[in-house]
Amino acid sequence: DEVLDGDDMVVLNYQIQSQSPLSEGASYEIATHLTMTSAAAGDWYLLFETNGNRAQAETDVTNNTLAVPITVTAPDLMVEIVTAPATAQTGQPITVSWRVANAGTAGTSAGPWQDGVYLSTDMALDGADTWVGSFTNHTALAPGGSYSRVQPVTVPIDLAAGSYYVLVRTDNTHVVLEGDGEDNNVTATGIVEITLSETADLVVEEITGPEFVTGVKVKN
């Protein structure tokens, strides 16, 4: 809103030194760049407050704030669909495909950002899940644009057998500034039943050698 209060985000503090003291009727101008790192896309106000620390004595401080309406745009990367085989074996590769779209109101830069692929026993990505691959995108994505990937990944040989989901998270290392658009970066497949692969079973079948062994002892 247009009212400055404790709920507002501070995006810049600018120390004025060269313009002090300011003569009666005089003015100064400041030009700078702001990066909106955490604001959600939509309509906002930029609030400008002069003498915010009240270091300058004034006859009236009620006119120290100005509100300027702005529209914030941001990309919003989302994983639209993920597919994988219904069955897999430990130690063996599977093919995973997914599509990433920009559902936001602004385009991305040319990147790069990574899409991460995980195996999970549930549909929520957390520290208990198993990472199986990361794949880099170097192409800018305009609003409404999308790209598709088809990649082989290998199921870890030491993974326990059971029911798993394949999870794909786009912008896996959070390099794309999406504002509030981070909560749709992960999508899961249906259940993938993973079984243990047959492993080698080495057996000593026979030992051969001479019946008698002669030893030599050397002493200095």
Regions found by a protein language model. Name each.
Residues 1-220:
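Extracellular/luminal regions of secreted and cell-surface proteins that mediate adhesion/ECM remodeling
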